[in-house]
UniProtKB/Swiss-Prot annotation:
GO terms for biological process: protein catabolic process; proteolysis. Pfam families: ClpS. Involved in the modulation of the specificity of the ClpAP-mediated ATP-dependent protein degradation. HAMAP family: ClpS (MF_00302). This is ATP-dependent Clp protease adapter protein ClpS. Binds to the N-terminal domain of the chaperone ClpA. Belongs to the ClpS family. PANTHER family: ATP-DEPENDENT CLP PROTEASE ADAPTER PROTEIN CLPS, ATP-DEPENDENT CLP PROTEASE ADAPTER PROTEIN CLPS1, CHLOROPLASTIC. It comes from the Bacteria. Transmembrane segments: none annotated.
Length: 96
């Protein structure tokens, strides 16, 4: 008699996603913010300029949406680069 096997379907859920948000300040230059957006978030010049203006006019702006691990890594890269350049630029991570 052949053995029968029951296969259970495992339902995989999508991972939670997190927004990386840059916060405007009165010291960090617009050029530095664009550099961050291009180098860390891989935005082209046009998109980086649009995002920078959003941050400047609204006080903050979303730079990208990632899994938690990647979002936290990008936040750390922003803060480290800003400290190295003597800018107070801050980034925060929020669940979407």
């Amino acid at each position: 008699m052949p053995k029968t096997q029951t296969l259970e379907q495992t339902k995989l859920s999508e991972p939670k996603m997190y927004k990386v948000i840059l916060l405007n300040d009165d010291v960090t230059t617009m050029d530095f913010v664009i550099e961050i957006l291009m180098n860390i978030f891989h935005q082209n010049l046009e998109k980086a300029s649009q995002t920078m203006l959003e941050i400047h006019h609204n006080g903050s702006g979303i730079c990208g949406i990632y899994t938690q691990e990647i979002a936290l890594s990008k936040q750390k890269k922003v803060i480290d680069a800003a400290k190295l350049a003597n800018f107070p630029l801050q980034a925060k991570v929020e669940e979407e």
